[in-house]
Each structure stands twice: as C-alpha cells, then as structure tokens.
Amino acid sequence: MLKSVAPYIGKYKKYTVIASVLTTLGIIANVAPYFFLYQLILPLTRHQLPDFHFVVVRVLLIFACLAFYAISYTTGLCFSHVSAYNTLKNIRISLKSKLENQPLGNIKEMGTGQIKRVFTDDIDQIELLLAHAIPEGIANLLVPLIVIIAMFIVDWRLALLTLAIIPVGVFAMSMMMKAGMSKMGAYYESAKKMNNTIIEYVNGMEAIKVFNKDGDSFRRFGDAVRGYRDFTLAWYKVCWPWMAVYNSTLPCLAFFTLPIGALLVLNGTIDLSQLLLVLCMSFSIGSSILRALSFGGKIPQLDYKIAELEKMMNGDAIKQGTHGFEGKNYDIEFKDVKFSYKKSAVVEPVETTNEEKSAVVSTSSTTVYSEVLHGINLTLKQGTTTALIGESGSGKSTLAKLLVHFYDLDSGSIKIGGQDITDMSIEALNNQISYVAQEQFLFNTSLYENILIGRPTATREEVLDAAHRAQCDEFLARFPKGIDTMAGDSGKQLSGGERQRISLARAILKNAPVIVLDEATAFMDPENEEKMNAAIAEIVKDKTVIVIAHRLSSIKNADKICVLKAGNVIAEGTHEELMKNCEEFQKLWAASTQAAEWRI
C-alpha cells in the first residue's frame, strides 16, 4: 500500500521522517511521567515521606515531560500533515493527467459520482496513512516495545501477565477486519450508487420539475440513500461487538497483572516496588498500543481505496505518439475506420443476507462492445468544407470525435496530411483542430478567461476581437462587466446559443487549420443563426472544415456532403449530385424542408 503512494511523496519524504522522530520523542515524554509517579509512590510503600525537594523536582519533571510531549507531538503532526497534503496534491495532479490521457468512454463509464469520490473522498483518506498511521504508528509501536523490554528486565513474570491481554484484543481486531473486508466491495458499490444518484438528481432538477417527476426521482434518490444507510448499519452491526472487545481490553494491560501480581507480592515472590513499576509501565503504554492497532482497523479501507485509485490511474491510456505535427498538408483521410462503444452489461446479482436486502446488492458485470462505425473510408481535402449528415445514431458525431482522438479506433486509421493521429502527441493534435460541439462547457470563471482557453498566450485585444467576430457583442453589452462577467456554474448565466457563440470565439481565437463544427448552430434562432453562419464563413477560409448539421439548408453550399446511415457512408457528393442520385439524401432533405416550414 505504502509502495503505491511513495512515488508521490517526493521531496517531502524527509518531512515524514522528521514527523516520525518528533512523535516518537513525544510518546517517550508522555510515558516518562509514569516513572516519576512511581518514584513518588515508592517511598510511601516503605512507610516513608519523600523529601519536599524530591517531590517538587518530580512534579516539575512531570509537567516538563507533558509540555515537551505536547510541543514535540504537535510539531511532528505539523510536519506529517505538510508531507501528507503535498502528497495528496501530487496524487490529484497525476490522476488529472492520467484521466486526460484516457479515452472519453472510460471517463463516462466511471460516472461523475465515482470520479468525484476518488478525487476528493478517497484521496483525502490517504491523509490518514501519511499524516497519522506512519508517524504515529511507528511511535506508538516503538515506545511500547522499549517499555515491554524494560518490563522483562524488572520481572519476566509480570511482563508476561501484562502482555497476556493483548492477544485477546488482537484477535478481536482481526475478526473485525475479516468481517469488514468481506463486505468492503459491496459497501463501496453502495456508496458509489448513492453518489451517482445524488449527482443525477441535482443535475436533473430542471427536468424533474418540468415533467413532475419529483416522486419517481426522489424515490430513486431515497432508495439509494436508504440502501447505503441500511448496508452501513448492517456492516457495523457485524463489526461493533469485536470493536467493543478490543477497545475495552487493549488499554487494560493490568487486567491480569494487578490481581496475580498482588498474590505474588503477598507470597513474597516479588517485591511490591517491582509490581508498582510494572503497573505504571502498563498504564503508560495501553493507550499507545490501542492507538497503533487502531490504524490496523482502517488499513483494509485504505487498501480498497488505493486499489480503486490505482485502477483509475492504470486505466488504458489513449494511444498517442511523441511527435509533433509533421503532415505535409491538412488533408484528412479516414481509412477502414471501425469503432465500437464499450458498455458494461450487468450479469446476475450475488445473493445477500436478509440484513442486506434493502441495501445495494453486489453484482458482477461484463464488457460488451457495440460497433457503430463499419469500415469508414473518407478523404477530406485541405481548404474544403465537408458536411456529415444522417439520421440520429448514424455515426456523424462519433466520426468527428474520433478525429479529435476522444477514443481509440478498433481498427483502421485516421491521418492528417499523411500523418497518423496516433503518431502525434495529444497536445500536437489539439493544436491542429478547433472543435465546436453542440453542448459546450463553460468554466465558472469570466467569459474572457473562457475564450482565452482557445489560445492562452493571446492578448486582450485578440480575445475581444474573437468575441466580436463570434457575434458576442450583443449579449456582452447587457452585462455591467461585459466580457469580464462570470459565466456561472457550467455557463448557466448564458443561454444555449450564447454559450455556443463563446465556444465559437474560442475556435476563432485558436485559429487552427482544421475546424470541426458539431451542430454548432443548434441552439440559434434564425436571426442569430444567420450571424453565426456569417462568422463561421469568415473563419473557415482556407481551412479543412467538417460540419455536422441536421438543418440541411445550412450545408447546401458545402464542397462535399457525406450521407451516413447505420455506421456506413452510403453516398457522397455535392448537394446537386445527391439530390439526383441518393434516395436517402432526398428523404433527409424533404424532412428538413418540411421541418423548416412547420408552424404552430
């Protein structure tokens, strides 16, 4: 487990070492007062009054040790937390990079809830290992070990009596861990379902209210939360008895020592001073042993969380090379492209006990593949505009997403200027393509910074010019802060059409040689669509353009139109050629024309 986390500690490893040393010194200082207490009690057992100076010195030493313990232990934890949170930062940055290099399908399959849980909750749990389990665990095991050796030096019989209760506590802890581990996977599946359901419920609030689905949606939400509650309570019901046993036995190391030791004193086998010293030692380390072993109870959970983290970290990275763009031009070639979407099919649920009936049951799943593109062959010449049309589900958007390398192909190749896109780094490929999708995400920052994403090195004047060319001036004038207005969560401050114009401004600013417009005018009213088309016409000059549209009137003048049906290209040509020779295009054109003429 620690081996998995160690690469991310980096230069902060020394902080963990310092923390371990300081906490160990702190625990020693916390144990020492019991020895001074023994020195104060010892004269009384011999019917003697200790010297006043002797008492004052011991009392001052006790306070000094407690003060040193507080300072040393707290300082040690400060060092360990600096190390821990910098390590968590490194893990999150690494996870972000790994996710960026994974196919979009893998990320969607995980779900927002699971990704959020791993990024926040699971990684936060590693803080327990780095900030507490390592420095405190070492200190709370090392110091008791030294004290136990000292006990054997005082009297081996009393030492064995002191240790006799520990196996009971360790056995109880092992049973608790065994019971917990048997349900660990199902517990986290229950938590994952609850997280995803909560996020779905919040994100779908608008649709829930519009279609009066409060009851159905809240029922699913409530079932997920209750399932998590019931499973957690059932899990803890199994663990609680064992937890109570080890929590009550481990601190009581004098359980056998006190009665049997007293008999040994009465029999004259040992001296009372020996018993008192061993009792003081046992009182001093009971809490330390409990603290050290308590981390053991949390290790299985950490193991599972780190395994989940590693699974996400080690997901299949998207295929990419290390070269920059080396193409001789910006012709695009799709050659024998086949692609399947990966789906998880749930198989039979695993039987559960009666206690878990209301909770989420454990399931097994298998991966199935649904081929959506079947040997696509297309050539798009530099400086031309190619439109992809077809019914919903025909593969238009999938083809565009494959060009920007959101997914890996099953087979075939996609080349730009003769260079396979898998030969380039993702960064190099992204520099060649501007992708404007139907649904554009805006970050909760200013509109200026959202446009600046297109080219981070651009000047403010260039950003303002891009916004102007994307027809953003009209709605920016409504805001007191203009382009510096905050976009809101997911761009909720703007309408759908306004968000698309901001995304188009990004593309204008980026000025890439290849442009993909995936339903870029889908949310536009006729007036704004005309403005957008004018802006698009300006930026696509001398560029290789792919347009995906349902409104066929908008792509009538495209250099080439490709008709897709059920994952195949069934025809390609100009508008006039397809109107003469392609029955499928004629049907699509008639449907589009009829839709445009529809009135209430």
Residue spans of the language-model regions?
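Membrane-integrated ABC transporters
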Residues: M1-N30, P50-V57, G76-S80, A84, ...
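An intracellular "coupling" helix at the cytosolic face of ABC transporter transmembrane type-1 domains
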Residues: G10-K14, L104-G105, D121-L130, I134, ...
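Transmembrane helices of ABC transporter permease
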Residues: K11, Y15-I28, Y69, P135-A186, ...
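Transmembrane helix-loop-helix hairpins at lipid-water interfaces of multipass membrane proteins
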Residues: T16-S72, I153-R157, L272
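Juxtamembrane helix-loop junctions of ABC transporter transmembrane domains
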Residues: A29-Y38, C65-T112, K116, T120, ...
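Short intracellular "coupling" helices and adjacent cytoplasmic loop segments at the cytosolic face
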Residues: Y85, I93-R117, D121-I123, T197-R220, ...
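Cytosolic ends of transmembrane helices, especially the final helix of ABC transmembrane type-1 domains
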Residues: K213, S284-M312
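ABC-type nucleotide-binding domain
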Residues: K328-I600
